[in-house]
A protein has these predicted regions:
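Local sequence-structure signature of Cys/Sec-based thiol-disulfide redox active-site neighborhoods
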Residues: 6-43
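N-terminal leader/targeting and pre-domain segments
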Residues: 1-21, 96-111
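Non-catalytic, surface beta->alpha helical segment in thiol-disulfide oxidoreductase systems
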Residues: 75-111
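Structural micro-motif
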Residues: 65-76
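Hydrophobic beta-strand anchors of alpha/beta hydrolase catalytic cores
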Residues: 22-23, 50, 73
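Structural microenvironment flanking redox-active thiols in thiol-disulfide oxidoreductases
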Residues: 56-63, 99
Length: 111
């Protein structure tokens, strides 16, 4: 029998990165999830994080983190610093990601 591993030991969380991992929990039937996706996409253009999408119905991670109210996101900086946000409404997703993720430095024509 294989030894069980903790969810934070998966490759998604152990791969070297500069920003946090943001896991979006969604389902095909979630009416509010498309708006959350658009908010995450908008913040991804200006802030540093790795974005992963999990189906809340089939995700063992969602089960382990007791995700019950969608839209939901996990913001994972480290084993000691992570937070699951659930039942997000309005601009909650944008507000959370702007607070949790650092701005990406972009060299453009205005630089």
């Amino acid at each position: 029998m294989a030894a069980a591993t903790d969810w934070w030991e998966s490759e998604l969380f152990t791969t070297p990165r500069t920003g946090p991992v943001v896991v979006q929990f969604t389902t095909e039937v979630c009416a509010l999830c498309p708006a959350a996706t658009l908010q995450i996409d908008a913040v991804a253009k200006t802030h540093d994080f790795v974005w992963h999408i999990d189906n809340a119905f089939t995700s063992t991670l969602a089960d382990e983190l007791e995700v019950h109210a969608l839209p939901a996101v996990l913001v994972f900086h480290s084993v000691d610093k992570h937070q699951v946000y659930q039942k997000l409404r309005g601009d909650d997703v944008t507000r959370i990601l702007l607070a949790e993720c650092t701005p990406r430095l972009v060299l453009d024509e205005d630089f």
